């Protein structure tokens, strides 16, 4: 919850990313939280996997669902692979039937049920069906089954939570980002959250009394009052997993990695590699 959300398409790596930030670093506590549903893995904020605290999943989905649906639909239309709303509705009905009773099933197991129900269940269709069900708040990650990801019904996995207004959600998202990622800029927050600049700017204004700002390098940098970093570099070495928030959580990464070395840490199409950190800078 402190981080807001953490990018999680590499399931093994994101468990490391969470575990190394604990007071007593380790993976077991993370796996237990995932199994018990205290931490969930779903498509949120941007059209990719993220880990999110159970108590935050509903308001974050409400804030980002339409953007993710639009992005996915545009991709499908551009590749001539559209799925009708009737097909999505049918998939949601099947999911409700087969997952009811706090069941957790893998994507392959769900695909078998889809096929028997007359739905296309190749990898493309399954990815689209499950992503839509996630952003609609129908399913989320289920109980852990080794290295296999499972799905469960969100309403059976997560107890009811209070609804937030849009302004409350924007403020809460900005708070989570700037307390865990500061110092950061408006552009960084917009990139991380998936919010357009107008809404990102509104989010910052909603929590302005809680923020300190500094002008540096022709940009405004924000730090939340509850940010835990002292701002002092340590001599410690850190091995960061791929897709770690230390890099992926910002639009501009040149403060910790020279632009000419970007290709050593991540590719143009969004693949991020594990890196070695020394005194706050990527050195390998």
Predicted regions span which residues?
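Low-complexity, glycine/alanine/valine/leucine- and proline-rich hydrophobic stretches
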Residues: 237, 245, 252-284
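Short amphipathic alpha-helical interaction segments
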Residues: 24-32, 120-132, 197-204
């Amino acid at each position: 919850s402190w981080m807001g959300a953490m990018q999680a398409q590499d399931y093994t790596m994101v468990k490391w990313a969470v575990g190394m930030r604990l007071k007593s670093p380790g993976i077991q506590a993370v796996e237990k939280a995932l199994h018990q549903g205290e931490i969930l893995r779903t498509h949120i904020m941007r059209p990719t996997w993220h880990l999110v605290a159970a108590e935050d999943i509903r308001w974050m989905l409400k804030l980002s669902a339409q953007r993710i649906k639009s992005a996915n639909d545009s991709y499908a239309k551009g590749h001539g692979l559209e799925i009708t709303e009737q097909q999505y509705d049918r998939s949601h009905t099947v999911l409700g039937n087969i997952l009811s009773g706090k069941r957790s099933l893998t994507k392959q197991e769900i695909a078998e049920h889809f096929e028997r129900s007359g739905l296309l269940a190749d990898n493309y269709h399954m990815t689209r069906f499950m992503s839509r069900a996630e952003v609609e708040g129908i399913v989320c990650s289920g109980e852990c089954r080794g290295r296999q990801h499972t799905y469960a019904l969100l309403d059976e996995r997560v107890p009811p939570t209070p609804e937030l207004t849009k302004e409350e959600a924007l403020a809460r998202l900005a708070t989570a980002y700037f307390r865990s990622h500061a110092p950061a800029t408006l552009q960084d927050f917009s990139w991380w959250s998936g919010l357009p600049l107008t809404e990102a700017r509104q989010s910052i204004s909603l929590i302005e009394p809680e923020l300190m700002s500094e002008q540096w390098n022709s940009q405004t940098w924000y730090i939340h009052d509850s940010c835990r970093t002292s701002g002092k570099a340590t001599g410690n070495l850190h091995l960061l997993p791929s897709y770690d928030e230390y890099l992926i959580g910002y639009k501009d990464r040149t403060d910790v990695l020279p632009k000419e070395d970007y290709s050593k840490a991540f590719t143009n199409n969004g693949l991020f590699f594990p890196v070695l950190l020394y005194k706050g800078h990527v050195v390998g």
